Design a protein with these regions (language model features):
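FAD-binding core/adjacent interface of flavoenzyme oxidoreductases
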Residues: 2-3, 7, 11, 77-169, ...
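Rossmann-like dinucleotide-binding core of oxidoreductases
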Residues: 164-220, 227, 238, 336-355, ...
Length: 454
């Protein structure tokens, strides 16, 4: 059996679920092996627990409670924080962008795991990209919460009815997991804090979900998806199906009704608009630009991989998670971009990498779903768990228990649990936190132009 004689370097690109799970599995095998060096490169020095992002946006969970420093959860892996400029699979080099404070560097690897995830897809609509809010990063959640509070503050004292309506209309684009859970949390927040704004009535608050398909939560059990739709409507959320966004200028979103039968020309009667200052875009994802401009063979921007999760023509290079294209042999469609699949691929990629180093047999990746879970509002959820379809309070309780158990550290488990308990007994905070750096020179200049008035 061939053994490693020289020190080999395994480099993992990314710091999301797939990257961290892969690193932990490799640490358990090679953590004390002086012949193997583990390296991780990520833009953020933390793992973000994305399933709870909507609860951060609604103010239920504190921001820092869903982030986990890489250096504390992958202690035997050397970490580089930086943006990846280029991956050269022929020279086996990963190059990082330089900054104003540090130079660009290149890192050599012997084995590579690409787990760079994805970014929001705006489908080429520059105005939407410029003006919409997203739900992908921790910053997105904080900015959205601030925006919601700001809109309530503006509407409270606004006398122009049209402008006031635009403040209180909140449009969520996308009826998948992210969109539906965001809409539910958003409505919960609005209803909870409305009492602090006397002039705003319940009927003034509008949360609208726009979905291009004919159903929400595609891929979920149809009966459960229908249950979710009805519950959301009972909460006052307007769900509009077969609606595609064509533009958003920051004041008005233009939408097109999608017909069953394609037409050569667009009937103007199918075009309408909604006045809103806040559009939340959760309608799709796309691989990061590093993948798109790489030398790897891609399809729809994703890296093509084989049954062992390896990149063809590049032995020892694996791709997992949202950036990899792996087709479900049953449906003949790519697997959805979920954390559950990313973690399953990460475990298999680590196992096959270990087999490759030890010159043993690799295994094909076969995915077995553990179920699906979604929260659709206060104390209500839907779940397919252990082959059983569940809805209502029990599904909500299962969601909380399952995701609480998946939080990597005990201290953060405790903090999130306490956040949930506090939310049961106390009101949500309506403070709007502004993190923009103070512009000192501009402020002093403006001050000099006026007399001191006290």
């Amino acid at each position: 059996m061939w053994l490693v004689k020289n020190k080999k370097k395994i480099v993992i690109l990314g710091s999301g679920f797939a990257a961290v799970e892969c690193a932990k599995k490799l640490e358990s095998e090679f953590g004390n092996d002086s012949e193997i060096e583990l390296v991780m490169i990520g833009e953020d020095n933390f793992l973000l627990f994305t399933p709870m992002l909507p609860q951060v946006a609604s103010g239920m969970i504190e921001t820092r409670h869903i982030v986990f420093p890489i250096r504390t959860i992958c202690k035997k892996t050397k970490f580089y924080e930086g943006r990846i400029k280029n991956v050269d699979p022929y020279g086996k080099l990963v190059t990082l962008w330089g900054t104003g404070d540090k130079r660009s560097i290149s890192i050599h690897y012997d084995f590579l795991v690409v787990a760079l995830g994805s970014e929001t897809n705006f489908f080429g609509m520059a105005d939407v990209e410029k003006n919409a809010y997203t739900m992908k990063t921790l910053n997105d959640a904080v900015m959205l919460r601030n925006r919601i509070i700001d809109m309530l503050e503006q509407a409270e004292n606004e006398t122009n009815p049209i402008l006031r309506k635009s403040f209180l209309n909140f449009v969520v684009v996308g009826g998948g997991f992210a969109g539906i859970e965001t809409a539910g949390e958003l409505m919960d927040l609005l209803l909870d804090v409305r009492k602090y704004y006397p002039s705003i009535q319940k009927d003034d608050l509008k949360v609208i979900v726009l979905e291009a398909m004919g159903e929400i939560l595609p891929g979920f059990n149809k009966k459960l998806a229908e249950f979710a739709k009805q519950k959301l409507k009972e909460r006052g959320i307007d769900i509009q199906l077969k609606k595609a966004v064509t533009s958003f200028d920051g004041n008005e979103v233009t939408i097109k009704t999608l017909d069953e039968t394609p037409k050569d020309s667009i009937d103007q009667s199918e075009i309408n608009s909604i006045i809103t200052k806040t559009l939340i875009w959760t309608a799709g994802i796309t691989p990061v630009n590093t993948i798109k401009r790489s030398m790897f063979k891609t399809e729809k921007g994703k890296i093509i991989i084989n049954d062992f999760l390896e990149v063809p023509k590049f032995p020892g290079v694996f791709a997992i998670g949202d950036c990899a294209l792996f087709v479900d042999p049953i449906t003949n469609r790519p697997f959805p971009p979920t954390a559950q699949i990313a973690e399953a691929q990460a475990k298999m990629a680590a196992k096959n990498l270990i087999s490759l180093i030890k010159n043993s047999e690799k295994e094909k990746f076969v995915y077995h779903s553990k179920g699906q879970l979604a929260i659709i509002g206060k104390r209500t959820g839907i779940a397919t768990f252990l082959g059983v379809n569940i809805s209502g309070f029990l599904a909500w309780l299962i969601w909380r228990n399952v995701y609480l158990s998946k939080i990597p550290t005990f201290d953060k488990k405790t903090r999130v649990f306490l956040d949930w308990v506090i939310d049961l007994f106390f009101d949500r905070d309506v403070s709007r936190l502004n993190f923009i750096k103070r512009e000192t020179e501009k402020e002093y200049k403006e001050l000099d132009e006026v007399d001191d008035v006290w």
